[in-house]
Amino acid sequence: MVGASRTILSLSLSSSLFTFSKIPHVFPFLRLHKPRFHHAFRPLYSAAATTSSPTTETNVTDPDQLKHTILLERLRLRHLKESAKPPQQRPSSVVGVEEESSIRKKSKKLVENFQELGLSEEVMGALQELNIEVPTEIQCIGIPAVMERKSVVLGSHTGSGKTLAYLLPIVQLMREDEANLGKKTKPRRPRTVVLCPTRELSEQVYRVAKSISHHARFRSILVSGGSRIRPQEDSLNNAIDMVVGTPGRILQHIEEGNMVYGDIAYLVLDEADTMFDRGFGPEIRKFLAPLNQRALKTNDQGFQTVLVTATMTMAVQKLVDEEFQGIEHLRTSTLHKKIANARHDFIKLSGGEDKLEALLQVLEPSLAKGSKVMVFCNTLNSSRAVDHYLSENQISTVNYHGEVPAEQRVENLKKFKDEEGDCPTLVCTDLAARGLDLDVDHVVMFDFPKNSIDYLHRTGRTARMGAKGKVTSLVSRKDQMLAARIEEAMRNNESLESLTTDNVRRDAARTHITQEKGRSVKQIREVSKQRNSRDKPSSSSPPARSTGGKTPVRKSSSSSFSKPRKASSPPEKSSKPKRKILKTVGSRSIAARGKTGSDRRPGKKLSVVGFRGKSSSARAS
């Protein structure tokens, strides 16, 4: 009885297997791979994973359902493969701040509008008036951190929306302080102070603050150098919430009693790297001293600090960490890297071309299209020469450098910004490389910068807030090494933080020394081989004769150094030619080495973008 039941069970199982084996032949698209299962795995699509075979068999007649099932199965298998990959281990040094910044970068992908960042309706109304809907990367990272009342450093490339990244949350925090703590607007007692290195940047930040003040309901004033003090004093005597200005002028108003520290709760240093690079450190310390003393009191709630920067070198970062202990660094993925929406062209000048004529040929196509162009020079003399040459060729220009008075610089910027004006070209120095929000289509570097940081600031004048731009650099012979290194770093999407002319030359010199050492070792080995080969007797010499009537033995390669051979020739005569040969060959190798060392040029060849599709060298010929 038991044997019969086993036979019936085996027949039923074999028939079922035979039936299922025929299904893939009838429906080829049902041929699925054998699923793989891993421990501790939770399927992405549980409904597809738990579907039984009878259900699939009953829905065979519905092709859409079968395609849907196959799609789910493929997704499940893809998820299995991804889960099987080992997780990438991060280095142990990357902890703390970088982990939190990476978390914020990941959450940035999920943020599609400003409402998800927790902004109030008042602030959202200001954004709607500005027609800004999607936050940038620095805004997704910075707004939540500032709203958590943390002291942070916001690092992102120029034109990425850093001003709104700190203004929006600070305005909302001031409104919350009014509701929770009963703080009100008072004369001469601002609650927020924004320090900027230049008057132009102060005016730019002030315009952004005024644009959102109508909906957010706060009052801001501008206090910067180059303007009369009396109107600023009258503005400070009114009820104020925010003061935007330069450090020197704000300290002057504090010393004269026009402004007090008592209610300052939020401090912003815009373009902090520029402030520390240009010697604003003593003024910043002088401004911070009363705030730090006030924060030591038991009843005081302290103040929140926000530093904003487009570049952050190691020296400036060390200084920031010393002055603002415990501050948190938040950086975007584009910091110290090229702007993705800008095209970078490097024109190599061999020395025979006229550099001013080359500049004119670069400008003509852009000016014919009606584009706005900025021409950067390293010195005042170079800027004057460019301005004079372009004026002689009927190209209207305006200047922006240190010798132009502040009021005249403002007028020149207005002429350059005017869409209907006749001054589409701005000839400037690095004074215009930072803090100016201009709609520039083309940036031309008549003089190549001395370091990569200045290159980044110059290129940041174009391709701002997602717009497209173009950057053209005229590279002379002395700047080719740095230009080649910058071009290589941008091609590999590397950071340009520590690239300077001195560093690149130092690295090239080290590489050259290493190559010369290797070449010297190789030449010494060749000399030793030649010496050994000359010391050996030629193959035509007669073989050594044996004594005592023994059978002669064929001479091997080592028999030339046998004792009978050495005895037949005096040692004095054999040693002198050796020294002479060694000395002659050595002097020849030293001369050859000196010749190759002088002819060799270190550095990588540039990819030349010539004028109008032709290389500059071909044009010169």
From Swiss-Prot:
Lineage start: Eukaryota, Viridiplantae, Streptophyta, Embryophyta, Tracheophyta
Reaction(s) catalysed (UniProt annotation): ATP + H2O = ADP + phosphate + H(+)
GO BP annotations listed: chloroplast rRNA processing; ribulose bisphosphate carboxylase complex assembly
Class of this enzyme: hydrolase
Protein name: DEAD-box ATP-dependent RNA helicase 39
Annotated ranges, domain Helicase ATP-binding: 143-330
Membrane spanning stretches: none
Region (Disordered): 497-621
Domain notes: The Q motif is unique to and characteristic of the DEAD box family of RNA helicases and controls ATP binding and hydrolysis.
Protein's gene: RH39
Binding locations of ATP: S156, H157, T158, G159, S160, G161, K162, T163
PANTHER family given in the database record: DEAD-BOX ATP-DEPENDENT RNA HELICASE 50 (PTHR47960)
SUPFAM superfamilies: P-loop containing nucleoside triphosphate hydrolases (SSF52540)
